[in-house]
Amino acid sequence: MRKVSTGFVYFFGALGGLLFGYDTGVISGAILFIQKQMNLGSWQQGWVVSAVLLGAILGAAIIGPSSDRFGRRKLLLLSAIIFFVGALGSAFSPEFWTLIISRIILGMAVGAASALIPTYLAELAPSDKRGTVSSLFQLMVMTGILLAYITNYSFSGFYTGWRWMLGFAAIPAALLFLGGLILPESPRFLVKSGHLDEARHVLDTMNKHDQVAVNKEINDIQESAKIVSGGWSELFGKMVRPSLIIGIGLAIFQQVMGCNTVLYYAPTIFTDVGFGVSAALLAHIGIGIFNVIVTAIAVAIMDKIDRKKIVNIGAVGMGISLFVMSIGMKFSGGSQTAAIISVIALTVYIAFFSATWGPVMWVMIGEVFPLNIRGLGNSFASVINWTANMIVSLTFPSLLDFFGTGSLFIGYGILCFASIWFVQKKVFETRNRSLEDIEATLRAKTGEDAAELSTTK
């Protein structure tokens, strides 16, 4: 490991999140111009938007088993290359099908980043800082979305502006690759693959030369590493079942509470309550800025409040905001007061999501799976998250036509409150606990210990 600061490691380790956010957010503005220049029908527009989601499902599915075998850092470098190729391929696409293929390739990198980075950051960070460090991923995602909104607005006056919008992502992709050349490998992976001295060196840097902490962590990792790498049978086995339920549940609830539909369709919502198109786009940028600020605050407090308490507070705030917003939208026609109430409620909803469910879901799926299948487990949870994202995004326009904006958001609000039951019943607390302690608790609960599992394939 080259001599680099912990800040450098955390920044470049999380940088893939910026590409994740940018590449999922930029299409909301670019599609307006792509549709006109390529003369796309409704189903073709839907495919341009959804191709990244399809690629993300594939990328997340592939990356988990691969990262357990080849390491987190190598796969992060590969993701950067795929980001770069996908961005330039999208920008230079001459026709519809080339664009779709490029967007699927890009989506594979997005899915890989979502499955890989939370695990990588969780395995690098000391237990007392893991929540803060892991939530940097979500901060980068929100920063990427904001950058996409600004880029969309900046190039909206150019005929070929959409090519610049899509191609701009190649710049941070190149930076991620260059930074990744210097990043260390995950110490957990290094111990598991027999590189003990290198793992100790990485932990020494990340723990700021606290030898007591380093020795304890090395011993704990070695104990977990005795267990042979597991596969799909262990992922669905008795011991991992509590982790799997948490991962799947958090991944689904984060999407079905309406977060991405609100973010993707915010300009449409603004125009529905009386904003002009230009004002709606500027308001979208304003929401993006607010989003980043709130997420930054969440990063600062992530290790000071229990994870379960954070998401439950978020669910209550989001649910109430959606109820208020739906009522405001029902009466927004011709009523400036109702329109203002709807916009305020929308902003409050996004604030609660950005401070709670946005970062905490990614933090926790990087924590709850045992070392020997952590990559596979995180990958599976990410696949579920992207699948739920795709289903919600594809069904939103039809549900909107059928129920209307107000009634639909009441439904999302009910799901917010349903998530509280799930968190209270199924989720265990992980704050200020080492990854090995979390794993030991799982094994104790299910009656399986390291000695038993180290002899099973």
From Swiss-Prot:
It is found in: Cell membrane. Pfam families: Sugar_tr. Uptake of D-xylose across the boundary membrane with the concomitant transport of protons into the cell (symport system). Transport is driven by the proton motive force generated by either malolactic fermentation or by the metabolism of D-glucose. It comes from Levilactobacillus brevis. GO terms for biological process: D-glucose transmembrane transport. Keywords: Cell membrane, Membrane, Sugar transport, Symport, Transmembrane, Transmembrane helix, Transport. The chain crosses the membrane at residues 14-34, 46-66, 81-101, 104-124, 131-151, 164-184, 244-264, 281-301, 309-329, 338-358, 380-400, 402-422. It comes from the Bacteria. GO terms for molecular function: symporter activity. GO terms for cellular component: plasma membrane. Belongs to the major facilitator superfamily. Sugar transporter (TC 2.A.1.1) family. Its main location: membrane. The lineage of its organism: Bacteria, Bacillati, Bacillota, Bacilli, Lactobacillales. Signal peptide: none annotated. The gene is xylT. Transport is inhibited by 6-deoxy-D-glucose. NCBIfam families: SP (TIGR00879). InterPro entries: MFS_dom (IPR020846), MFS_sugar_transport-like (IPR005828), MFS_Sugar_Transporter (IPR050820), MFS_trans_sf (IPR036259), Sugar/inositol_transpt (IPR003663), Sugar_transporter_CS (IPR005829), XylE-like (IPR047984). Induction: By D-xylose. It is a multi-pass membrane protein. This is D-xylose transporter. Beta-D-xylose binds at residues 138, 254-255, 260, 362, 385.
